[in-house]
């Protein structure tokens, strides 16, 4: 089948499950939501190489593909989004990539030992490479000192940073991501992770 036919088939599959998905979201029936989404998620993975997540936004339902760094999946997710039927778009917002501070980000929690942290507990220290137009970042969480595995802390920092600012800005402006167990002593710019999107946009708009 062509990519166009695959996209049509996917949205037909989604439409067949749409009432069940919407009911589960509205009633916050998460086990029911998982059951309703499972075959559609499998279809998305087979056809685009990525999954998606759904949310009950303020006045509309929202669906977001999560293609990660894979360029083919990014292309297919955007193509599928562009072909979403108008009937679905009457009730749904459909995003081809992870958006800044989505509901998923707002609700994200990280458990470290006996402590639970949200994005509000994370800070990012950063410098701007003016020549490359990128940000060199270090993410701090009070619980990082309790984790011995450096790779795990770096992966967590990368994931949460992308969750906070969205995939588009992450790929366009983040030059490096690292972690710190304690706030750095040298003078660098910093902000809460939930405020980093605005900080990036302020710098980008100022320099353009």
Residue ranges and their predicted role:
Residues 30-40, 74-77, 153-162:
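Well-ordered, non-membrane alpha-helical segments in soluble/globular domains
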Residues 89-147, 201:
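Aromatic/basic-lined ligand-recognition segments
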Residues 141-208:
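Glycine-rich, aromatic-bearing surface loops/beta-hairpins
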């Amino acid at each position: 089948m062509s990519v166009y036919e695959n996209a049509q088939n996917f949205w037909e599959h989604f439409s067949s499950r749409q009432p069940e998905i919407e009911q589960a979201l509205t009633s916050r029936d998460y086990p029911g939501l998982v059951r309703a989404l499972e075959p559609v998620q499998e279809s998305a993975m087979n056809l685009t190489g990525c999954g998606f997540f759904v949310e009950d936004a303020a006045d509309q339902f929202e669906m977001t593909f999560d293609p990660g760094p894979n360029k083919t999946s990014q292309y297919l997710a955007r193509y599928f989004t562009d072909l979403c039927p108008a009937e679905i778009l009457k009730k749904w917002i459909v995003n081809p990539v992870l958006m800044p501070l989505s509901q998923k980000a707002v609700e994200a929690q990280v458990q470290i030992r006996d402590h639970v942290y949200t994005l509000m507990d994370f800070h990012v220290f950063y410098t701007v490479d003016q020549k490359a137009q990128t940000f060199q970042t270090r993410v701090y969480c009070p619980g990082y000192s309790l984790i011995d595995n450096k790779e795990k802390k770096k992966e967590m920092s990368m994931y949460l940073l992308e969750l906070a600012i969205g995939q588009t800005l992450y790929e366009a402006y983040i030059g490096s991501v690292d972690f710190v167990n304690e706030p750095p002593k040298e003078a660098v710019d910093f902000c809460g992770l939930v405020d980093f999107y605005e900080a990036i946009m302020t710098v980008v708009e100022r320099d353009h």
